[in-house]
Amino acid sequence: MDNEAALSHLVGARISAGRAALALSLDQLATRTGVSRAMISRIERGEVHASAVVLDKICAGLGIALSNLFARAAESPLLRRADQPVWRDPQSSYLRREVAPTGTGSAVHIVEVEFPAGAEVTLGPAEHRVIEQHVWLLEGQMQITLGPTIHTLNLGDCLHMHPDRAGITFRNPGALPARYAVILTLKAS
């Protein structure tokens, strides 16, 4: 099984476990999220590589952060680059790498994102999942829309936000890919 298939199965298992923990049927989760029952079922079985937008809706319905879907049990406080979970959004082709070891009890998650030129992704409010988030631009240019405000980030800029208050749109207006770090502080489950 390749990394993408393994990660799809991990994501599916996490969604299924989250749904079971809340004693939700597929129909109930579909109603909460606006994602079809059939799509949720296919994701849970690892048959579909869902987009960030779809996974974000499911996470909102489960009350968890997107990072929780990719987290692995901590085996060490050191997570080598070769072992970091990597996921590619099938819609926008952005690449998401979980940089920090998960399962350590830390409320902080660090994600590296490679965002293609011209790509755009809109995620809903993080509601009760994320307390705060920083986006630190390492390469390229990004526009981040939070509510009615558009923030243009250039090399080295860092944006602090509370994503529970409004949806977020990530857009790369440049001709080159952008790379940035996202530092999330998650609420305790």
Briefly describe each language-model feature range:
Residues M1-L10:
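A detector for short, charged/polar N-terminal pre-domain segments
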Residues A13-A30:
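Short basic helix-loop element that most often maps to the first helix and adjoining turn
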Residues V35-V48:
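Recognition helix of helix-turn-helix/homeodomain-like DNA-binding domains
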Residues A52-A107:
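A short, N-terminal "cap"/entry segment at the start of jelly-roll beta-barrel domains
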Residues V86-P125, E132, V182-I183:
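A short glycine-rich, His/Asp/Glu-containing loop-to-beta-strand
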Residues S106, N154, P163-S189:
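Ligand-binding loop in jelly-roll beta-barrel domains
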Residues E112, E127-I144:
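Short, conserved beta-strand element in jelly-roll/cupin
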Residues G147-H162:
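Short acidic-glycine-tyrosine-enriched beta hairpin
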